[in-house]
């Protein structure tokens, strides 16, 4: 039995200070290094702050570990409510599969980036 995780992005458009492609590139580059997650979050925030001084950013990371991919059964639901301006504020959710030293182990990071225009 093979398990798979699918992340759906329900956002209609990415109206942030960075393109979807650029943000994906930043997240892949930083989180695929062998750094502790808190350090990686700080690096992402530093790059985002360089790209826009007009926004505040929040980065949330959820790490999923499956010790046995044949029996892993994940179900993760996450919801957020906001009272922000849909034209200038928003969120981006991204999945990053991580390499593993063991073939029967699956590790995935679920990364959410939120921004609010000042």
Swiss-Prot record:
Keywords, ordered alphabetically: Cell projection, Cytoplasm
Cell compartment(s), UniProt: Cytoplasm; Cell projection
Chief location category: cytoplasm
Classification via InterPro entries: Tctex-1-like_sf (IPR038586)
Signal sequence extent: none
CDD domains from the UniProt entry: DLC-like_TDA2
Gene Ontology cellular component annotations, sorted alphabetically: cell projection; cytoplasm
Family: Belongs to the TDA2 family.
Protein name per Swiss-Prot or TrEMBL: Topoisomerase I damage affected protein 2
Native source organism of the sequence: Kluyveromyces lactis (strain ATCC 8585 / CBS 2359 / DSM 70799 / NBRC 1267 / NRRL Y-1140 / WM37)
Gene field: TDA2
